[in-house]
């Protein structure tokens, strides 16, 4: 049976690991160290570690794999194949070249578009109507290896980064399992990425999280769904942060300054730069838990006036 080392960290990687383990001999799992999570900073294992332990697979958690003692241990396992999916570290050539069949990665974009750590976010932020998964060879340069297989999936108006993560995770697992038999048999010729079509999906900055109400409504709508459920787009209300977790887009055009609110007893609409409307559905005022807009308008939202503007 083919011996595989799997490397991954977030929930995205779990279905891929589980599918691999159902058919192949996963001899080791490498993931990031446990990290403090939440306000109480509780030390929490990555989702992949939890899944690996349930599957009784040995787990390695080096802080920096390149300089760790675990690197030589992994090379000594003499795996047939290394598979990664959102692991989170650049791997050294000594490891990439050690398995018989090399090292491959499951990446959540249609490469060469969106190399980097936030491909799903950027597909939503840019208003794409489709994205997908690419399986490619691992090289030391970020997401630059030759492509082995690729599969597309639509992005709907109702999708956000969270829903697309779930869909792409399942798609990645399916594509990997469909690809591996021919790949291991040497029947697939990989295709080089077109350097002229390369784009990057760098980690989201704090500046990208803040809503600029002078932007067109469609741009703001894509920002909100592209940053949900993490890190969440925000604006300000009376100079305090106000997160918008979920919203819809209304292309009806109205007169008014960007950021101006239109409201009734149960709903809230905000005028964007082109006069179209953002309709928040799930929000989080400063110091409060997230809530639906109806609950907000039945409480603190009753104090808003039509002269109130977001972002001031």
Curated annotation (Swiss-Prot):
**Entry keywords, A to Z:** Protein biosynthesis, Transferase
- What are the binding positions for (6S)-5,6,7,8-tetrahydrofolate in this chain? 109-112
Q: Supply one GO molecular-function term.
A: methionyl-tRNA formyltransferase activity
Magnesium is among the record's keywords = no
What are the GO cellular component annotations? cytosol
- Alphabetized InterPro entries for the sequence: Fmt, Formyl_trans_C, Formyl_transf_N, Formyl_transf_N_sf, Formyl_transferase-like_C_sf, GART_AS, Met-tRNA-FMT_C, Met-tRNA-FMT_N
Gene3D superfamilies referenced in this protein's UniProt entry, alphabetically: 3.40.50.12230
Top enzyme class, one word, equals transferase
What does the record give as EC number? 2.1.2.9
Q: Which PROSITE patterns does the record cross-reference, listed alphabetically?
A: GART (PS00373)
Transferase in keyword set: yes
* Catalytic function, reaction form: L-methionyl-tRNA(fMet) + (6R)-10-formyltetrahydrofolate = N-formyl-L-methionyl-tRNA(fMet) + (6S)-5,6,7,8-tetrahydrofolate + H(+)
Extract the CDD domains matched here: FMT_core_Met-tRNA-FMT_N, Met_tRNA_FMT_C
Q: NCBIfam families, alphabetically? A: fmt
Q: Which family does it belong to?
A: Belongs to the Fmt family.
**What is the role of the protein in this entry?**
Attaches a formyl group to the free amino group of methionyl-tRNA(fMet). The formyl group appears to play a dual role in the initiator identity of N-formylmethionyl-tRNA by promoting its recognition by IF2 and preventing the misappropriation of this tRNA by the elongation apparatus.
Q: What is this protein called?
A: Methionyl-tRNA formyltransferase
* Organism whose genome encodes this protein: Listeria welshimeri serovar 6b (strain ATCC 35897 / DSM 20650 / CCUG 15529 / CIP 8149 / NCTC 11857 / SLCC 5334 / V8)
Upper taxonomic classification of the species?
Bacteria, Bacillati, Bacillota, Bacilli, Bacillales
Q: What gene name is given for the protein in this entry?
A: fmt
């Amino acid at each position: 049976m083919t011996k595989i080392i799997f490397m991954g960290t977030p929930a995205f990687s779990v279905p891929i690991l589980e599918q691999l383990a159902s058919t192949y001999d996963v001899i080791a799992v490498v993931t990031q160290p446990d990290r403090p999570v939440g306000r109480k900073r509780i030390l929490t294992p990555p989702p992949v570690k939890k899944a690996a332990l349930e599957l009784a697979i040995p787990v390695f958690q080096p802080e920096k794999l390149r300089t760790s003692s675990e690197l030589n241990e992994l090379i000594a396992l003499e795996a047939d194949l290394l598979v990664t999916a959102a692991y989170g570290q650049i791997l050294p050539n000594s490891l990439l070249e050690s398995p018989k069949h090399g090292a491959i990665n499951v990446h959540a974009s249609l490469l060469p578009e969106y190399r980097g750590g936030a491909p799903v976010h950027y597909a939503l932020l840019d208003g794409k109507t489709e994205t997908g998964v690419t399986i490619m060879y691992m090289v030391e340069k970020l997401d630059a290896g030759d492509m082995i297989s690729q599969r597309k999936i639509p992005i709907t108006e109702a999708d956000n980064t969270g829903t697309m993560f779930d869909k792409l995770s399942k798609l990645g697992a399916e594509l990997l399992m469909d690809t591996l038999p021919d790949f291991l048999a040497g029947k697939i010729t990989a295709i080089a990425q077109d350097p002229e079509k390369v784009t990057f999906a760098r980690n989201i900055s704090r500046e990208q999280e803040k809503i600029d109400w002078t932007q067109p409504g469609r741009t703001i709508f894509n920002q909100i769904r592209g940053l949900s459920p993490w890190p969440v787009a925000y604006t300000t209300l009376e100079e305090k942060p106000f997160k918008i977790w979920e919203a819809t887009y209304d292309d009806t055009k109205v007169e008014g300054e960007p950021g101006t609110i239109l409201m009734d007893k149960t709903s809230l609409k905000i005028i964007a730069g082109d006069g179209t409307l953002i309709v928040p559905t799930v929000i989080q005022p400063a110091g409060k838990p997230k809530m639906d807009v109806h609950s907000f308008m039945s409480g603190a939202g009753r104090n808003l006036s039509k002269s109130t503007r977001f972002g001031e």
